């Protein structure tokens, strides 16, 4: 008898988890938004920067601390496998300057469409949108199911399962659904949650020249971060200077 697995969150990670688990198990993919891939839709300014075509060392050198943590996952499914996965799902890709990989169409909706195609092809996967997970049920250290609330009728119902995959993302963009729910559930199931801190932050610059350039998007900008004589970072890329209200 096939195992029953619940995947919470239908972003890129959740959809990939459902597709993989669906090869050998019955999967219920639950999304609280009315559609899948809401954050994926806006990434890369709507173009969806899928991955980078660089060597493994490029990835590991970009991880500020504890890059060894990424070794097993990266070598199990590296960037080339990601690209092959999407192209086989009818989402052709292109490589731009700096090794950045985008869909040929420049539309993130094509990446989402590739995931949806693979989900729809697999009869072992059921997708449930507009449904919010309220609780992960545990007994004697074992996950036994989830409690959900469907938006349409506001009624709570329990769903039994053998395992739960939490793919709810962080808490960086609440408007897309990343509200930090996964941390709360993990803690209640016995995991230790460390204090969170943002990994992507804006720079506030005092110089008047930056204020004069508000609203511009610049290409091939070199960034050097130094403290005293020590240089911490050198990077080149696109620089966006938002307009302050």
Segments from the language model and where they lie:
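N-terminal Rossmann-like FAD-binding beta1-loop-alpha1 element of flavoenzymes
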Residues: 3-29
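Redox-cofactor binding/interface segments in oxidoreductases and associated redox assembly factors
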Residues: 8, 42, 166-167
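Glycine-rich active-site loop/strand segments that organize a redox cofactor
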Residues: 47-95
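Helix-loop-beta segment of a Rossmann-like dinucleotide-binding subdomain
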Residues: 65-73, 87-116, 161-163, 167-175
């Amino acid at each position: 008898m096939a195992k029953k697995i619940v995947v919470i969150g239908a972003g890129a990670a959740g959809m990939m988890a459902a597709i993989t688990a669906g090869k050998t198990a019955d999967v219920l993919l639950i999304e609280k938004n009315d559609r899948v891939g809401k954050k994926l839709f806006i990434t890369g300014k709507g173009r969806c920067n899928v991955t980078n075509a660089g060597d493994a060392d490029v990835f590991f050198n970009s991880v500020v601390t504890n890059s060894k943590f990424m070794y097993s996952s990266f070598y199990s499914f590296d960037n080339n496998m990601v690209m092959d996965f999407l192209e086989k799902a009818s989402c052709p890709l292109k490589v731009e300057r700096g090794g950045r990989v985008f869909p040929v169409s420049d539309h993130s909706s094509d990446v989402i469409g590739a995931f949806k195609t693979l989900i729809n092809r697999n009869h072992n996967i059921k997708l449930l949108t507009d449904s919010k997970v309220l609780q992960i049920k545990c007994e004697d250290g074992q996950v036994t199911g989830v409690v959900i609330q469907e938006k349409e009728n506001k009624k709570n119902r329990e769903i039994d399962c053998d395992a739960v995959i939490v793919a709810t993302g962080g808490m960086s963009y609440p408007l897309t659904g990343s509200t930090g729910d996964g941390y709360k559930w993990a803690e209640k199931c016995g995991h230790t949650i460390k204090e969170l801190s943002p990994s992507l932050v804006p720079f506030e610059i005092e110089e008047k020249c930056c204020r004069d350039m508000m609203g511009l998007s610049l290409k091939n900008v070199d960034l050097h971060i130094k403290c005293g004589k020590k240089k911490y970072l050198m990077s080149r890329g696109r620089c966006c200077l938002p307009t302050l209200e």
